[in-house]
Amino acid sequence: MTKQIVTGIIGAGRIGKLHVQNISRIPHMKIKAISDIQASRIKSWADSHQIEYITSDYRDLLHDPDIDAIFICSPTAVHAQMIKEAAEAKKHIFCEKPVSFSLDETSEALAAVRKHGVTLQVGFNRRFDPHFKKIKTIVENGEIGTPHLLKITSRDPEPPNIDYVRTSGGLFMDMSIHDFDMARYIMGSEVTEVYAKGAALVNPSFAELGDIDTAVITLTFENGAMAVIDNSRQAVYGYDQRVEVFGTKGSAAADNSRPTTVEVSTADFVMKDKPHFFFLERYKDSYEEEILRFAEAIGTNQETPCTGNDGLQAGRIARAAQQSLAFGMPVSIEHTEKIAF
């Protein structure tokens, strides 16, 4: 019989609530408590999910002996500190991306995880998307030979508000970081060099905050392969998520996911559904799957499928992209931490 995993959720925003819904459907997982700085506002919602208690102090969850695992869904600025404290409390940890805006803080958090022997999974949910998993399997099985080129298109349907942008860490840390992780995951090689170009073309006011909303990033891998990622904060037709890998024996591509596969053809037009508009619709399956794999890693005492090191490496690429954009030149990952920025 599978031992039940008792969890606590830190942060009851959009992603925290999504995890609560998904965990509630897993028989061998239970949510005991939720922490949110505005605990009173979530009481009725928490009651509807049979949560034992809510609190405004996340440390109450860390001190609860019944809780086995913590889900960190709070703002990025406090992720690393919460990881360290959760590790010290011997709690397994699921942390949303990125681990931190600081590579040093990320390394310190991972050191705490290793020291206390707990499980850490970083929330790069796209690894668990069935379309992208299929691409990964095709590459691993050698069906397209040696991969040489990777193309990722990742475009949001509408830009975030200015208040969000102020604390987001910027396009590369907030949005592109998913694509940086996907690039490593699919190609199976570490990135050695990053060259990023970008501008605030959708909303010029982003530039006043030192951010961009449109970017093209070129990655070079240790094995010599290359990747091109294009990002935009606004694709008016929907949530545009496409991947293509080209290799010595062929190519593999994942197109956009749509509400239906129906295509209407007449003498005047060919029409099909637009891509899903919202990321929670597009990646619904992946959000469910990542939690199942986290629970499996805890139950079997195995490494998670998206480790703390995966979070660190994606963060290093994001940092290099920031530096490349600022200096207008390619940046070596090896030198990322050494560049004054």
Swiss-Prot record:
The keyword Phosphoprotein belongs to this UniProt entry's keyword annotation: no
Enzyme Commission identifier(s): 1.-.-.-
Coiled coil spans: none
Superkingdom, taxonomy of origin: Bacteria
Molecular-function GO term, any one: oxidoreductase activity
PANTHER family in the record: BINDING ROSSMANN FOLD OXIDOREDUCTASE, PUTATIVE (AFU_ORTHOLOGUE AFUA_2G10240)-RELATED, NAD(P)-BINDING ROSSMANN-FOLD SUPERFAMILY PROTEIN-RELATED
Protein name (database record): Uncharacterized oxidoreductase YrbE
The species this protein was found in: Bacillus subtilis (strain 168)
